[in-house]
Amino acid sequence: MGGLFSRWRAKPSTVEVLENIDKEIQALEEFREKNQRLQKLWVGRLIIYSSILYLFTCLIVYLWYLPDEFTARLVMTLPFFAFPLIIWTLRTVLIFFFSKRTERNNEALDDLKSQKKKILEEVMEKETYKTAKLILERFDPDSKKAKEFEPPSAGAAVTAKPGQEIRQRTAAQRNLSPAPASSSQGPPPQGPVSPGPAKDASAPGGPPERTVAPALPRRLGSPATSVPGMGLHPPGPPLARPILPRERGALDRIVEYLVGDGPQNRYALICQQCFSHNGMALKEEFEYIAFRCAYCFFLNPARKTRPQAPRLPEFSFEKRQAVEGSSSTGPTLLESVPSAESQLIEDSLEEQDVLDNSTEQRDDKIPVTEQTSQVIEKTSGPEEPAENQEETENEETSTNEAKSPVLRADSVPNLEPSEESLVTK
């Protein structure tokens, strides 16, 4: 009766078959994970519990049940030598048991995957495009991901970037624009190609490009022809500032820490137009440095102008020598003149003091001398000529001393015109 009813039952569709296969595959994968967890659990528990039991039994036997005789001790310790071997064999048995279960599980899983693959191939051959696409998206998403990550073939066209499309279009227009003019006027004469640098052509929305003139004519469609827009970007001018290496050793880090230099003590030079990194500058030079971008060639001005010191006056060597000579001779003359004048004035003042003192003493001595002369005249008459001679000598000396300062004082102003003449000269 079951065979009769089975004839009238509807045949399951491919979608139902694939669903059942997916369920079985999922169950087998779960069982494999569960089996691996159980294997680790049982093996770990066996080792832990057996080691704890082994240590406790060894301790108990050593403290209470260890006999004194050597043969009895040997018989008592034999089970302790056999116990690790027993544990190791149990561990291998458990690993073998779980590994066999995983092998059977993997075999069943491989069979289901092969069945699923065959059914999907039949779907791609027999079913329509729409149903086949739906079935593949539902039951075989890995193939779609693999197609997305496949590299493009060599014959496929290379997708250009947004900025590159403009460059290719402008380059193609430059190459195709002189074609009709040359066809009407005939082939132009081919002159020698100058080996100098090519001219720069500015492309809209990008840095200046160099038009590369081909040295030899090539056939259209040959494999050696270069794609327009590829390799036209100039290398750019060399950077005047050093760029720190990315990989630095321990010695470099120590030196940078001691000197106070390094990436952590520098400021990045970012272009204002394309926001690209153009090296690093020191903290003292960051605000005063102006640089040209190495990628878009934009000149980034300095944030501040460096303060300049005031300009010193210019002196020639001959003028400097003349000024030094005049400054060296002038003060010596001026210093010598006042020194001579001061000495003369001091001498004259001292002499005047001496004269005043001498005149006062002479005035005081005059009455004394008169009285003494009278006494002497009374007492001794023949001694008068000697005393008169002494008086006359004293008077002459005093008069000579009075005349000498007057002469010296008169000689002082005679020196003044000579000093003035020296100054004027």
UniProtKB/Swiss-Prot annotation:
Q: Its GO CC terms?
A: endoplasmic reticulum membrane; endoplasmic reticulum tubular network membrane; nucleoplasm
Cytoplasmic compartment segments: 2-45, 99-425
Q: Where is the composition biased (Pro residues)?
A: 186-195
Q: Which residues form a coiled coil?
A: 15-41, 101-128
Q: How does it sit in the membrane?
A: Multi-pass membrane protein
Q: Which domain of life is it from?
A: Eukaryota
PTM comment, free text:
Myristoylated; myristoylation is necessary for the endoplasmic reticulum (ER) three-way ER tubular junction formation, but is not required neither for membrane translocation, membrane topology formation, nor for the specific localization to ER membranes.
Phosphothreonine: residues carrying this PTM:
T211
Compartments reported by the entry: Endoplasmic reticulum membrane
The GO annotation for biological process reads: blood coagulation; embryonic digit morphogenesis; embryonic forelimb morphogenesis; endoplasmic reticulum tubular network maintenance; positive regulation of endoplasmic reticulum tubular network organization; regulation of chondrocyte differentiation
Compositional bias segments (type: Acidic residues) = 384-398
Zn finger (C4-type) ranges are: 271-296
Record's InterPro entries? Lnp, Lunapark_Znf
Q: Name one GO molecular function term.
A: identical protein binding
Q: Region annotation Disordered: residue ranges?
A: 144-242, 320-425
Residue ranges of the TM segments? 46-66, 78-98
* Keyword presence, Metal-binding: yes
Tissue spec: Expressed in most tissues at basal level, with reinforcement in distal limb buds, genital bud, and in parts of the central nervous system.
Lipid group attachment sites (N-myristoyl glycine): G2
The UniProt keyword set, sorted, is:
Coiled coil, Developmental protein, Endoplasmic reticulum, Lipoprotein, Membrane, Metal-binding, Myristate, Phosphoprotein, Transmembrane, Transmembrane helix, Zinc, Zinc-finger
Which PANTHER family does the UniProt entry name for this protein?
Answer: ENDOPLASMIC RETICULUM JUNCTION FORMATION PROTEIN LUNAPARK
Another remark in the UniProt entry says:
Was named 'Lunapark' because the protein sequence contains the word 'LNPARK'.
User: What's the family?
Assistant: Belongs to the lunapark family.
User: Which function does this protein serve?
Assistant: Endoplasmic reticulum (ER)-shaping membrane protein that plays a role in determining ER morphology. Involved in the stabilization of nascent three-way ER tubular junctions within the ER network. May also play a role as a curvature-stabilizing protein within three-way ER tubular junction network. May be involved in limb and central nervous system development.
* This protein's domain notes: The transmembrane domain 1 and 2 function as a signal-anchor and stop-transfer sequence, respectively, generating a double-spanning integral membrane protein with a N- and C-terminal cytoplasmic orientation. Transmembrane domain 1 and 2 are probably sufficient to mediate membrane translocation and topology formation in a N-myristoylation-independent manner. Transmembrane domain 2 is sufficient to block the protein secretion pathway. The two coiled-coil domains are necessary for its endoplasmic reticulum (ER) three-way tubular junction localization.
**Name of the protein described by the UniProt record:** Endoplasmic reticulum junction formation protein lunapark
Q: What gene is behind this protein? A: Lnpk
